[in-house]
Amino acid sequence: MFIVVVTIFENYTQWYSSLLTIFSLTIKRKLKTIRSMQDSTSKCTCTEHHMGGTICCCCRSDAEENEQLTSVILSRKPPPQEQCRGNLLVFINPNSGTGKSLETFANTVGPKLDKSLIRYEVVVTTGPNHARNVLMTKADLGKFNGVLILSGDGLVFEALNGILCREDAFRIFPTLPIGIVPSGSGNGLLCSVLSKYGTKMNEKSVMERALEIATSPTAKAESVALYSVKTDNQSYASFLSIGWGLMADIDIDSEKWRKSLGHHRFTVMGFIRSCNLRSYKGRLTYRPYKPKGFHPSSNVFSVYEKTTQQRIDDSKVKTNGSVSDSEEETMETKFQNWTLPDSDETLAVGSSDLEETVVIEDNFVNIYAVTLSHIAADGPFAPSAKLEDNRIHLSYILWKDIGTRVNIAKYLLAIEHETHLDLPFVKHVEVSSMKLEVISEGSHVVLDGEVVDTKTIEVASTKNHISVFSSTA
């Protein structure tokens, strides 16, 4: 008996040591980056004079700092209307990421927009669904050239689903481009867009390029595919990811370290979850992707050449200068039909074509489906994904296939090097629709980085798209 106990202990110590070795260099490197960032900002210059106000960012509490920054931002003088090159609706989440979004706007984004003669209306969000409610009810969206978001993917998700509640949602989606300045822990949409144009995937390069595009009068936008999502009690528009199991838990359970570690929180929690690995019983159903003649194409346009309303008007006008009744009816009913795939080429899970449907009921370690290449700056999760393409890149890991916990650690670290899909225990397939049914409790269902309260989630590709700031002329 003693020998058995000793053997078990030695095996446990061996795999724990292996996990620690695998993660140690990565964690040390990321924590070194955090310390260097903290050191670079620790010396107080006390005051910065900007936009008619004085900003001190290190000698008072976060609440006092946010209050003063908000006051300075809202009291700015916009460029004269006759000189204006464009107009943006700006949403700032003061609590996203490490909590520096207000400072970023006051000291960097605002001055650059002023210099470019771009006017802006600022909304500083005060809590969940603030941006959603603004975009759901705002009557003058048409006057803006675009929306600029200082936060992470979560606020983009909230904004899109606010627009989804409007009667003119499917006119607004492609004609109101969204710009992003990374201020949250997760910036998958931005990284996916920038990587297409060769931006290096590190924090400094992503921020610099995002700032350049967001504040440039020659900014261009292009199409990003939109997906239909249905849960137990609500429907959503989605653009990025659906997760359940390991990676969803890492994302949500590390939220408590958001301000102290930033996006490095994922690495630390990844180590913890690899040591304390869980399995989850669920049923996964999916339809393999078949294009069937549908070839998505990207619509690239200048952000400031026209307002949103002008782009909407252009989309209505046909060669004879009128809009057909059938077209208007189609646009009005798209909102009602959003719970179904808006495509003749794809079918919802559970349709009559059962021979093409795959069903897996088992114990899962991880289910993660993405529609874009990146979920963060570390490396592409789905290297073959394209912005405008309407296929879903589904990957999953079964408990019976993983072997040891060390393999999970290798999987998480392999994402950064684009080799995770080559691991033998990782299954991946391109699908047009999928359905997840949660059988056992214990994990979060995460949609575009946000927790959704549901035991069933259905996702389907559509022909709809949004537009996102992507480049400069």
From Swiss-Prot:
Predominant cellular place of this UniProt entry's protein: membrane
UniProt pathway: Lipid metabolism; sphingolipid metabolism
Residues annotated as catalytic: D153
Domain DAGKc: residue ranges: 83-233
GO molecular function, one term: D-erythro-sphingosine kinase activity
Annotated disulfide bonds: none
Residues where ATP binds: 93-95, 125-129, 158, 184-186, 258, 265, 448-450
GO biological process, one term: lipid phosphorylation
Organism domain of life: Eukaryota
Keyword Mitochondrion belongs to the record: yes
GO CC, alphabetical: axon; cytoplasm; intracellular membrane-bounded organelle; membrane; mitochondrial membrane; mitochondrion; neuronal cell body; nucleus
Protein name as it appears in the record: Sphingosine kinase 1
Lineage: Eukaryota, Metazoa, Ecdysozoa, Nematoda, Chromadorea
